[in-house]
Amino acid sequence: MSLNDFLQTLSNAVGEKNSNTLEKCIILDPSEPSFQQLSKTLFLDRKGKNKLNGTIQKEFGRIRGWKELVTTYFEYVENAASSPDQRKWELLQNLYSNLTTCFSHIDGAWLCTIVKRVSKLYVKLSLQLDTSTPTLEDSFDGNGFIQRKYVSDASRNVLRTFNSILSDRQQNINPSKKDAIFCIANLLCLLYFRLKQIRLCQTIQANVISSGADISRATMAELVTFRYYLGRCHLYQRKIHQAKDHLLFSFLQCPDECYHQKRLSLIYLTTCLLILGKSPTKGLLEKYKLTAAFEPLIKALKSGDIKSFRLSLEDNSRRKWFIKRGIYLTLLDRCEIILWRNLFRKVFLFTFEQSQKTPHVSGSYLLTAARLSTNDNSYDMDDVECICVSLIDQGYIKGYIIHASSTLVLKKDPSFGFSVIESLMPIARNDHAEKEFFHANA
């Protein structure tokens, strides 16, 4: 196909808003035969190349952004295959910026499919370069964070695309710019997590929920990914119930062949479950190679073995593994109270006698258990009473302390005041808009 024929086909696609034809024209993979053929034509057709700018101006100059888009696409085709990744990224970024301009037109919704495809490639290459580019000594910002040029630039450009989607107020049209909202939101979350700017993810997610986007227009893969990141953000905010619900959906709906993605969901789902007094089955942990990471913690939590839990969490390799995934502090902070609750329950059940009119446990037993479980003899009765008061105040134990006799008196019911942990954890700052968004689109 000559350059003139290619440009005519491309011009017709733009004029007719034919996304299928445009998809066939805009090829980004240098290994594709059509890409190679166009690249060869650009190289060989010197006469056509000299007239190229004039032809592009004639065919595409009437619509803002399209002349620049076609020009940068030809630059990409001509140079991408022979350029290093850094140069290829620059070419792709120029192309993406102009594509976003075209997409921002009031009637740009027909470009949704190609915008999603180019966005994915752009973000993928940005992340690859971020990983492969060595960190320089002076590449830190004023706050001490690593400056990530490729990811930072990508996040700004993809955010521009996202804002274009949000600003589209047209209702009940097909296609709609909002057809791309979940894909673009997920890419932004991926970039923001790499940048450790999780609060920006929360802003993106809130905008998606308030946008009135139709979940039925999203693919299951997009929805699974969106709820995975939503669960991660809720876990970051210590909203454990909400995090568990989204991560459970993400894990269950993710296809079995997507092993890595299911494993990621299970890592954070398991973290939520431990805080809620639950745990996955051994078989599930084994299947996703998480036994070494979580089984020692689960065993210690169930038995109230505080020393073993701390040693397991502080194990050098395990600690690094948890820190890398951003759950170390969450486990350290939220599991401590569960350990004390389970330890005191274990002591009560071991010492309880049916002859007791009111269930209770002596503080001396609790003190002995505290010293043994922590391997710390510095604990005294005041410490034990403070722990009991904290457990009662947070609802983990229903009862009261008799200070004079150092006795923990428990509620007279089948659970003896030790209610199911999940029912005690508060649903912090329940977001009704979020709940209604997923319920309305169920």
From Swiss-Prot:
Keyword Glycosyltransferase: no
Compartments (UniProt record): Cytoplasm; Nucleus envelope
Claim: Hydrolase is one of the keywords in the record: no
Gene Ontology terms: cellular component: cytosol; nuclear envelope; nuclear pore; nucleus; transcription export complex 2
Pfam families registered for this protein in UniProt: PCI
Primary location class: cytoplasm
InterPro entries: Csn12-like (IPR045114), PCI_dom (IPR000717), WH-like_DNA-bd_sf (IPR036388)
Start and end residues of each PCI domain: 224-415
Molecular function GO terms recorded: double-stranded DNA binding; RNA binding
Keywords: Cytoplasm, Nucleus
SMART domains reported for this sequence: PAM (SM00753)
Protein name: PCI domain-containing protein C1105.07c
Gene Ontology BP, a term: transcription elongation by RNA polymerase II
